[in-house]
């Protein structure tokens, strides 16, 4: 089993895979008479294909045992997929570049409390992986006609460890 250690999630490290959603950066400004601060344009939701539309959903995820035994990844060919935690707890993010015959070697990240992610359209990624206790998330992804899910099962498992 190949061992992979998760590293901290940063905008720079995650850029090839999608967007980090947090209140960092300088693209923010006051709204509502100065009573609120808007952090603007943090990610791009993408929805393509027949009758495509952007959906907003919620999910309650159950934590996995660590180290995580990664045997499968998935991707969504018609749209991006964002996971925004509704509590200030970290979660595990696993992604892979596209290879010649499926996904390449996985990369693992651990979010800082309050960070969310937006997977690019057609990106191989692991399943939602809360840490320690159940966690609620807001999901922004694609609805419409056609199957927007492909799964790939690795011939050998990867073992994902926290730092």
Curated annotation (Swiss-Prot):
Q: What is its EC number?
A: 4.3.2.3
**Gene Ontology molecular function:** ureidoglycolate hydrolase activity; ureidoglycolate lyase activity
The answer to whether UniProt assigns keyword tRNA-binding to this entry is: no
**What keywords tag this UniProt record?**
Lyase, Purine metabolism
Q: Does the keyword Lyase apply?
A: yes
What top-level class of enzyme does the UniProt entry assign?
Answer: lyase
Note the coiled coil stretches, chain numbering: none
Q: Which family does it belong to?
A: Belongs to the ureidoglycolate lyase family.
Tell me, in a sentence or two, what this protein's role is: Catalyzes the catabolism of the allantoin degradation intermediate (S)-ureidoglycolate, generating urea and glyoxylate. Involved in the utilization of allantoin as nitrogen source.
Q: What is this protein called?
A: Ureidoglycolate lyase
What species is this protein from?
Mesorhizobium japonicum (strain LMG 29417 / CECT 9101 / MAFF 303099) (Mesorhizobium loti (strain MAFF 303099))
Gene encoding it?
allA
């Amino acid at each position: 089993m190949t061992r992979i250690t998760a590293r901290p999630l940063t905008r720079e490290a995650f850029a090839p895979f999608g967007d980090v959603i947090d209140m960092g950066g300088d693209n923010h400004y006051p709204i509502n008479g100065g009573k609120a601060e808007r952090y603007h344009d943090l990610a791009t939701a993408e929805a393509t294909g027949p009758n495509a539309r952007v959906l907003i959903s919620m999910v309650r995820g159950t934590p996995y045992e660590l180290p995580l035994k990664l045997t499968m990844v998935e991707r969504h060919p018609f749209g991006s997929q964002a996971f925004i935690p509704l509590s200030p707890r970290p979660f595990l993010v696993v992604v892979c570049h596209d290879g010649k015959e499926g996904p390449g070697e996985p990369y693992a990240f651990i979010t800082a409390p309050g960070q969310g992610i937006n997977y690019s359209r057609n990106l191989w990624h692991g399943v939602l992986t809360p840490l320690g206790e159940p966690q609620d998330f807001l999901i922004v992804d694609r609805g419409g006609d056609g199957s927007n899910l492909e799964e790939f099962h690795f011939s050998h498992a990867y073992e994902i460890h926290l730092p």
